[in-house]
A protein has these predicted regions:
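Phosphate-bearing ligand-interacting subdomains
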Residues: 1-43, 47
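Conserved acidic residues
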Residues: 9, 56, 110
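Glycine/Thr-rich phosphate-binding loops of Rossmann-like dinucleotide-binding domains
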Residues: 21-22, 68, 140, 156
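Hydrophobic, well-structured mid-protein blocks that either form specific transmembrane helices
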Residues: 27-84
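Glycine-rich hexapeptide-repeat left-handed beta-helix
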Residues: 80, 91-92, 97-158
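Short secondary-structure transition/capping segments
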Residues: 18-27, 54-60, 84-97
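Residue-level signal for short amphipathic helical patches enriched in basic/charged
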Residues: 18, 67, 85, 103, ...
Length: 158
């Protein structure tokens, strides 16, 4: 409240939310209620194609790549070295961990966590509040709330 009273108009949410997404979301709610603008923050070493579209509050870390026609929702994190290929859609609060790779046309649902070094194949849809463990390979759609264990291939073999 003191910052807002002093005329500060912008704020950045520094809560990552890997283990406690609700903390990250509550900080965004608080910042919005207090009237702060949460700008998109893009590290100078990230490579962003001109046609990529960012909502406010998104954060892009060093050496990340965001391809053509990508849509990045409010409060998303694209962490260090992550690759978001052409035509992907990241819904609000999606969190891509370091080294995650999304092939073209991937859709990531709201408040979903994509772990480190995850690979998601072309045109896969990952549902809301899903959790994809580190090093997983995702070859088919993941439902809302789905969990893909670390180091596995989705879908599991029958």
């Amino acid at each position: 409240a003191e910052l807002a009273d002093a005329g500060v108009q912008m704020a950045v949410n520094g809560i990552g939310g890997i283990s406690d997404l609700e903390s990250r979301l509550s900080v965004y709610r608080l910042l919005n209620e207090m009237g702060f603008h949460t700008p998109t923050m893009i590290h100078p070493t990230a490579f962003i194609e001109d046609s990529a579209d960012f909502a406010d509050g998104a954060q892009v870390f060093p050496l990340a790549y965001v391809g053509t026609q990508v849509k990045v929702g409010y409060g998303c994190i694209i962490n260090t070295g992550a690759i978001v290929s052409h035509d992907c859609i990241l819904s609000p609060y999606a969190n891509l961990s370091p080294g995650a790779t999304l092939a073209g046309g991937v859709s990531v649902g709201e408040s979903t966590l994509i772990g480190m070094r995850v690979t998601i194949n072309l045109y896969v849809k990952v549902g809301k509040r899903a959790r994809i463990g580190n090093g997983a390979t995702v070859k088919a759609d993941v439902p809302d709330g789905g969990v893909v264990p670390a180091g596995t291939i989705w879908p599991p073999r029958q």
